[in-house]
């Protein structure tokens, strides 16, 4: 269970915004070009509500079950699913205005589009790419990305708007930013190549608490921040009885 307080969240969020502003200045970018997503994994809705009150309107979750439990408890937020999505859980996400960051295979694209068709809605998604070829991370390979984007865009109720990646962890004592930056650069190059054929592939969801500066330098349009806003994670997923 989280031990952060409301005051901690507002203070930490301010520090994150300062880091983003400094990184954008160094990259000759506007801070408005980078969307900060607060990842509330394991943290209670009370802290998510405080983040929204402090102006952090975009929130992310790794698990579908935790996402669905928190959504009705946090007014005014825009939600993102940033963790792996099982095909049988697709029906639980579609129709809730959730941006899925983890589209990684054609069968999942089919499941999302099929459910969206039933609800007569459009499901937005990002294709997750395993740019570091890390077996511990999800996502399609760089070589598979083009075909997956092409496949998904033919589905009438699915809109692919960009790419997402999670780079490999640095080695012991390594600098997260220096370790991650080549992978962020690779995703940016892939996005640029895909945009020539698929102009709607705009967004780059990359960068977390430890390496957001490197992500901004390489063109991230979305960064996923957990610990730097909400403090250390709890030992397990948040449960409704803990609110």
Name each region found by the language model.
Residues 227:
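Glycine/alanine-rich phosphate-binding loops at beta-alpha junctions
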Residues 219-223:
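Conserved acetyl-CoA-binding loop of GNAT-fold acetyltransferases
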Residues 236-243:
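Active-site loop ensemble at the mouth of alpha/beta enzyme cores that anchors a bound cofactor
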Residues 1-210, 216-218, 230-235:
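Conserved alpha/beta-domain cores
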């Amino acid at each position: 269970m989280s031990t952060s307080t409301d005051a901690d969240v507002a203070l930490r969020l301010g520090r994150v915004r300062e880091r983003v502003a400094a990184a954008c200045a160094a990259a000759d970018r506007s801070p408005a070009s980078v969307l900060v997503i607060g990842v509330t994994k394991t943290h209670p809705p009370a802290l998510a509500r405080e983040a929204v009150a402090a102006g952090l309107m975009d929130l992310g979750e790794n698990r579908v079950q935790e996402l669905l439990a928190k959504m009705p408890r946090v007014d005014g937020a825009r939600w993102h699913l940033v963790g792996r999505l099982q095909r049988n859980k697709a029906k639980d996400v579609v129709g809730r205005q959730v941006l899925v960051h983890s589209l990684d295979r054609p069968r999942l694209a089919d499941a999302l589009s099929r459910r969206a068709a039933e609800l007569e809605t459009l499901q937005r998604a990002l294709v997750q790419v395993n740019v570091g070829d890390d077996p511990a991370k999800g996502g399609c390979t760089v070589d598979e990305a083009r075909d997956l984007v092409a496949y998904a865009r033919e589905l009438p109720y699915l809109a692919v708007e960009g790419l997402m990646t999670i780079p490999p962890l640095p080695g012991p004592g390594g600098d997260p930013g220096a370790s991650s930056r080549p992978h962020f650069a690779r995703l940016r190059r892939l996005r640029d190549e895909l945009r020539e054929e698929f102009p709607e592939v705009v967004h780059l969801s990359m960068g977390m608490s430890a390496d957001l500066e490197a992500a901004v330098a390489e063109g991230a349009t979305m960064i996923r921040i957990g610990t730097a806003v909400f403090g250390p994670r709890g030992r397990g997923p948040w449960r409704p009885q803990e609110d």
